[in-house]
Amino acid sequence: SRMLTDPPRIGSMQSLGSSPTGPLVFVSSSPQLSPFLHPPGHHGLPSQSYYLETSSTPLYRSSVVTNQLSASEEKLCITSNRQQSYAAAGSGVRVFEMANETRYCAVCSDFASGYHYGFWSCEGCKAFFKRSIQGHNDYMCPATNQCTMDRNRRKSCQACRLRKCYEVGMVKGGLRKDRGGRVLRKDKRYCGPAGDREKPYGDLEHRTAPPQDGGRNSSSSSLSGGGGWCGPRITMPPEQVLFLLQGAEPPALCSRQKVARPYTEVTMMTLLTSMADKELVHMIAWAKKVPGFQELSLHDQVQLLESSWLEVLMIGLIWRSIHCPGKLIFAQDLILDRSEGDCVEGMAEIFDMLLATVSRFRMLKLKPEEFVCLKAIILLNSGAFSFCSNSVESLHNSSAVESMLDNITDALIHHISHSGASVQQQPRRQVQLLLLLSHIRHMSNKGMEHLYSIKCKNKVPLYDLLLEMLDGHRLQSPGKVAQAGEQTEGPSTTTTTSTGSSIGPMRGSQDTHIRSPGSGVLQYGSPSSDQMPIP
């Protein structure tokens, strides 16, 4: 027999076939092999190479077998050189490149160090989020809760940094979607044919962001209606809900209109309607930041906004006026008292109701966390009631809205339970706060009637967004609304919005306008510059 002390090379593979006629050939194993037959990586060695062995023991093969295989093996090695190189690149090199692919932090756009809390993030944001969820996170933004987060300015505002962490989706215990884990495998369950499979959104109440009704993805594993498997239950912690709601609050506005006092009916209503139109723009931007709101269909978003816009504006007015007894702070430069409402017929009654509600909120010592929860509840709860004719469509995905409403209610209950109140006082305070919402709805109905009367008088020009919201609400019967619409078709009611947008389709009585689901009130989501930092 002939002993080969060195591993064979590609060009010398013919020597394996032309070995002496001895019965055995000794081939020593060595880690130094041909590069295309031994690709770097952790995927093992090619199985088609007969002379490769991973063990350190010598390999003895018959020379007869060697003679039969050498020719075919030589041809295979020569012709498949390029294929083996591609295979090596596909297995080892590609994995190496994927492992070293550059990723950036979802919060500050710095280089990401790994997948932390559900998203790619850097070490700084990972440590910051960990400290925030484990300790106190009652951060306050010194500006308008809209600070820029980048590598250089991420430490300037802790409140906006934590808000950005929540906005990108960082959660405690987050895992990569393309990887398993004991938690995910444990939560996955099979929905039986007689159980949740009959309900397309049977597991929706456990989700933070409900899926869109109009464009559901059938391939998504988070929906239980598309297949038999239900995704893992994802819940948003109450602290995260409260933080997102507080970060979504719009900035303080200014009317920027100088009108001589005493006010007349025209000047008073011009000031109030102009201010309401500006607030509506910011209200739409606020609603888009409510957890889960943008996951709803466009129809449901418009429906909720048109049903609750005046209530949302009123509770904001009440909150701004809570520290000024006897005053209503419509803007930083527009503060009115009860006597100034006498110039408009019926306005003094609405002012009295507003001041009484402000006094009640002041007596209850309303907290900022409670205010943002009540405000979101007003928005989401408005879809459960119908104010007008049967022609108004109901919500497409009412179960998703109910799930969002449950999350907001849980956040309110969580805050009250951690506010230091006794066990007996906690449910009492919850009832006291929720009962005030009926008073706000009553004031909203009064205010809507008053706006319709102003529209019928045709003395004060109404802005397009305010007109669209007013006609979309349709508080009165269709006949009265149609009559009001005919009376307001004069040139004095056709103005431009504060944002410069053209009038959108209205759900009013005007037959020439047809509502389009892709346009309307949601196009006014870009706030104007009529704002100032909150002091």
Curated annotation (Swiss-Prot):
Family, as annotated: Belongs to the nuclear hormone receptor family. NR3 subfamily.
Compositionally biased residues, Basic and acidic residues: 195-208
DNA-binding region per UniProt: 105-170
GO CC field: nucleus
Region feature (Modulating): 1-104
Species in which this protein is naturally found: Salmo salar (Atlantic salmon)
GO biological process, one term: response to estradiol
SMART domains per UniProt: HOLI, ZnF_C4
Name listed for the protein in its UniProt record: Estrogen receptor
Name of the gene: esr1
Xref: Pfam families: Hormone_recep (PF00104), Oest_recep (PF02159), zf-C4 (PF00105)
Main subcellular location of this protein, as a coarse class: nucleus
MF terms in GO: estradiol binding; hormone binding; nuclear estrogen receptor activity; sequence-specific DNA binding; zinc ion binding
